């Protein structure tokens, strides 16, 4: 591949990219994308399921699953899905066209015993369906990371959420360094990383540049970089946050693509706020994966039929290439 891989991006360089005229930024990002992916433009479809919902000990300001908040989710009893039910949903997602199945647990850290045994069984079952398997479940130990790798887990998700500078405005129950340590444990076990962030939480463009600098400074780069727009949920501290601008999400996708040429840049939460045209701009900017299905953990997502229409309008195809790799 001819795309230049760097891990030494200066903050000023990244800010300058974010400030480029949009047409110039899109041109640059598309060049990088095509250089890094000469075989053609394919969009990976990923499905996301909340296995354990609610009751999380963390206080992430954006999250309706936190026990510290008063959302509709926290008002309900905690829900834990069983292995058979999860695998049935994975099978349905595969049959609908998804290539990757992501499973989420609202935990501060992975819990040993029966819950972890069930997680391992789910991972094995998803892999047997021929899908990539991704887990997001908070912090984990070296041993847990190794056992997940042995079960066949493709990728571990642990987002940084925002910049180091803005982080203490969003969460107080886990440090930024703990997030980085979790990523390193997953990497040391041979797992690929899924790690990105969220815009629209009161951060500045400089904060967005700083988040991207941290992500691009990871060596190797995360194989998967989800770019989320805040979904402001009633009952969370960010419920009244001013809505983010769709073109700001396009800019984040484009700069993520430029900084991390070979990563899958995943268009993630908040996509319902985007018109079909804005989503096509995100694809042009370098997004090559979308979350596919009617929900993302506890928030809604565009309908499958709408996404099929999106891909058709953009003239791009979904692809099974890269299974077990990203």
Curated annotation (Swiss-Prot):
Keywords, in A-Z order: 2Fe-2S, 4Fe-4S, Biotin biosynthesis, Iron, Iron-sulfur, Metal-binding, S-adenosyl-L-methionine, Transferase
Gene Ontology terms, MF aspect: 2 iron, 2 sulfur cluster binding; 4 iron, 4 sulfur cluster binding; biotin synthase activity; iron ion binding
Entries under InterPro entries matching the protein: Aldolase_TIM (IPR013785), BATS_dom (IPR010722), Biotin_synth/BioAB (IPR002684), Biotin_synthase (IPR024177), Elp3/MiaA/NifB-like_rSAM (IPR006638), rSAM (IPR007197)
Catalytic activity entry: (4R,5S)-dethiobiotin + (sulfur carrier)-SH + 2 reduced [2Fe-2S]-[ferredoxin] + 2 S-adenosyl-L-methionine = (sulfur carrier)-H + biotin + 2 5'-deoxyadenosine + 2 L-methionine + 2 oxidized [2Fe-2S]-[ferredoxin]
The EC number(s) this enzyme carries: 2.8.1.6
Residue stretches making up the Radical SAM core domain: 41-271
Keyword Protein biosynthesis: no
Obligatory cofactor(s): [4Fe-4S] cluster; [2Fe-2S] cluster
UniProt pathway annotation: Cofactor biosynthesis; biotin biosynthesis; biotin from 7,8-diaminononanoate: step 2/2
Gene Ontology biological process terms, A to Z: biotin biosynthetic process
The record's free-text note on cofactor binding: Binds 1 [4Fe-4S] cluster. The cluster is coordinated with 3 cysteines and an exchangeable S-adenosyl-L-methionine.
Entry similarity comment: Belongs to the radical SAM superfamily. Biotin synthase family.
HAMAP family linked: BioB
Main function: Catalyzes the conversion of dethiobiotin (DTB) to biotin by the insertion of a sulfur atom into dethiobiotin via a radical-based mechanism.
Protein name: Biotin synthase
Originating organism: Synechococcus sp. (strain RCC307)
